[in-house]
C-alpha cells in the first residue's frame, strides 16, 4: 500500500495535486492546516477526494466546519474526531486535532487533559498510524530556526498509543526519527512549499521517504 502524507498547505493545494499525479497513492493523509475560511472551499476538497481516499486531522489554519462536511467517495468523513479512528484496508489510523493551549479561546486549541483523554481512547484500538497537527516534544520537532517546537502532551500521547507510525506537522520544517523500539515519527514539513512524505506499508512495516515536489 502506498500512502502520501501532506501538511500545512495554508490554502495552496497545487502541490497536493502535483503529488497525487506523481505518486498515485492509495491513501492521502494530512496532518492539518489545509487553509482557513476564505482560502479553501468545498470544490477544492471535492477535486481531491475524487482522486484519492483522504484522512485528516485539523490544525490551527483550517475551516473546521467545512472539514466536518467533506466526505470521501465511499461516504466516509475525511476528518478524524479526537480519540477516534478510521480504518483503511488493514490499517487503523487515529487522530488528535489542533494545537496545544491552556484554554479554549480558539476552536483549534486542545489542552493537556484533552490530549490525554484522546490518547486513552486510542489505546484501546491498536492504532497503526497516529496523526496530530502539533508535535511531540523532542521528537521530530525542530523549527526552521533550529529550536524545539513540540509539546510534552503529544509525547505522552505517542508513548501511550504506541503506533508504528506517528505523523505530525505545524512547524513548517520536515524532520523524522525512529525510536529504539522501531516506531517512526515524521514531521511532514511545509507542503505549501513542496514538502511531503511517501510511505509504503508492506508486511506490517512502513518504508519511508521524505520528498519535495
Q: Locations of the language-model features?
A:
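Extreme N-terminal starter segment of soluble prokaryotic enzymes
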Residues: 1-4
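Core catalytic region of metal-dependent phosphoesterases/phosphodiesterases
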Residues: 6, 11-88, 160
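Residues at the C-termini of beta-strands that transition into short coil/loop
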Residues: 7, 58, 83, 97, ...
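Divalent metal-coordination and catalytic microenvironments
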Residues: 8, 28, 33, 59, ...
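Active-site environment of divalent metal-dependent phosphoester hydrolases
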Residues: 10-16, 35-40, 60-68, 86, ...
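Conserved catalytic scaffold of divalent metal-dependent phosphoesterases
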Residues: 11, 55, 62-149
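Binuclear metal-dependent phosphoesterase catalytic core
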Residues: 15, 85-89, 156-160, 173-213
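Proline-aspartate-enriched helix->loop->beta-strand connector
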Residues: 25, 127, 151-171
